[in-house]
Amino acid sequence: MAMKSWLITGGAGCGKSSFATLLQQQFSPPLPCFSADVAVAEVMSRESTRSELVTAFGAQALTQPGEVNRHWLRDVVLPDPVLRRQLEGILHPPVLAALETARGEAETAGVNLFLAEVPLHYEIGGTVSADLVIVVASSRSVQVRRMMETRGLDEQTVHKFLDAQWPIEAKVERADAVIWNDGSLTSLEAQVLTLASPLLQA
């Protein structure tokens, strides 16, 4: 049986990672899940990436110890469409290459279902192939509250961050499946089970 690929996306603060973890745990052994966020962190740790960031944005792209200045990128680059596209041009190609490597390794290992968590799937043009695109969504107020609580950001910064992404409604319209995550963990678990049940019974 050919391996299937499910792509998990959605808005910041919607609980994509929680959903992905719960979905993984429905299967034994747990399904492999590629995380674009983890891949971005790995790419940013490379000396070559830091050099590209300095070339594109100047010395302020790095902190004094020479690490990527994530706060500056978040506050200055992400809200600016032109600068954001420059940043995406640096980060996205190696991240997408890592995704395809992980997919290939999963297929070689004989995995039946491969998961990929790609938060900006639609923002980068929906170029990642998948048999099913799942959008994990929440209301804006819940997104804001969660991001303030989990990331320690003030409300204004959160709104700037969210405004740099597609509206969650636009992602929902394009989804193959939608997980609405405004409620409790129990509600999220129930939706995960509903989605996974056909595969578990196969």
Regions found by a protein language model. Give the residues of each.
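ATP-dependent NMP and nucleoside kinases share a basic, alpha-helical "lid"
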Residues: 100-108, 113-150
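Small-molecule kinase domains that catalyze NTP-dependent phosphoryl transfer to phosphate-bearing small molecules
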Residues: 99, 127-129, 149, 153-198, ...
